[in-house]
Amino acid sequence: MANSNTNQLHPLGATTSQTFITALNHTAASTIAINFRELIKEPKELDEASNYLYQALLDDVVAGIFIETHHLRKTGNLAALDGVGEENLESAFHICEMPNLDIFGISTAKKQMDCTCPNCDRLVAAARFAPHLEKCMGMGRISSRIASRRLATKEGSSASTSSTSTYLQSGGNTGGTDDEDDVDWSSDKRKKKSTQSSRNNGSKKNNGKTF
């Protein structure tokens, strides 16, 4: 074949080579179609022209398959094109039939979302996060009242503690003790009792006299 060397791939890119071959084959085929009558007259030239057309078509098909395979190899789709072998067919189409799982074995149960409270750092369910945060930060009406009461109680307890400590300190400075206070109280009580008994006796004597 005289023109078979012109159809060989040049050291260019795959797409450029295919475009070049397609253009060259189109030109050669057009030339053969124009000179078809003259080629019929010469059996030798007719044989060469038919061989040229066959080789051009074969090269075009082989180049197309090569470029497509190369593209699939680079993109990683060659394994998908090959498919799954018969030995791996059963494992490839295994269907999961367990409860709460889909056909691929993925859980279908809804997982409850938890949120962390920024105030107390506790894990709270997402559905109860808003009311918990409102109560925890004292932003609601009832919560604000409770928080105010707690604050007032805290202030009252601190005030009573401070007054008690002040009283104890003042008692210690004057030198008074609990025992002395008890003695004074008992003596006053005895005096009151003796005075009352003397009054009762005097009234009885006066009632017994005659005038």
Swiss-Prot record:
Name the InterPro entries on file.
SAGA_su_Sgf11 (IPR013246), SGF11 (IPR051078)
Q: Which UniProt keywords apply?
A: Activator, Chromatin regulator, Cytoplasm, Metal-binding, mRNA transport, Nucleus, Phosphoprotein, Protein transport, Transcription, Transcription regulation, Translocation, Transport, Zinc, Zinc-finger
Would the keyword Transcription be found if you checked this record's keyword annotation? yes
Species for this entry = Drosophila grimshawi
Q: What is the name of the gene encoding this protein?
A: Sgf11-2
User: Which chain regions cross the lipid bilayer?
Assistant: none
Q: Where is this region: Disordered?
A: 149-211
Gene Ontology biological process terms from the UniProt entry: chromatin organization; mRNA export from nucleus; positive regulation of DNA-templated transcription; protein transport; regulation of transcription by RNA polymerase II
Assembly, in brief, is: Component of some SAGA transcription coactivator-HAT complexes, at least composed of Ada2b, not/nonstop, Pcaf/Gcn5, Sgf11 and Spt3. Within the SAGA complex, Sgf11, e(y)2, and not/nonstop form an additional subcomplex of SAGA called the DUB module (deubiquitination module). Interacts directly with not/nonstop. Interacts with the AMEX complex component xmas-2. Interacts with Cbp80; important for promoter recruitment of Sgf11 that is not associated with the DUB module.
* GO CC, alphabetical: cytoplasm; DUBm complex; nuclear pore; nucleoplasm; SAGA complex
What is the name of this protein? SAGA-associated factor 11 homolog 2
Region forming the signal peptide = none
- List GO molecular-function terms, semicolon-separated: transcription coactivator activity; zinc ion binding
Report the domain remarks: The long N-terminal helix forms part of the 'assembly lobe' of the SAGA deubiquitination module. The C-terminal SGF11-type zinc-finger domain together with the C-terminal catalytic domain of not/nonstop forms the 'catalytic lobe' of the SAGA deubiquitination module.
**What subcellular compartments does it reside in?**
Nucleus, Nucleoplasm; Cytoplasm
Query: Which residue windows does the record flag with biased composition (Low complexity)?
Result: 157-166, 197-211
Where, per the database record, does this protein carry Phosphoserine?
187
Q: What does this protein do?
A: Component of the transcription regulatory histone acetylation (HAT) complex SAGA, a multiprotein complex that activates transcription by remodeling chromatin and mediating histone acetylation and deubiquitination. Within the SAGA complex, participates in a subcomplex that specifically deubiquitinates histone H2B. The SAGA complex is recruited to specific gene promoters by activators, where it is required for transcription. Required for nuclear receptor-mediated transactivation. Binds independently on SAGA to promoters in an RNA-dependent manner.
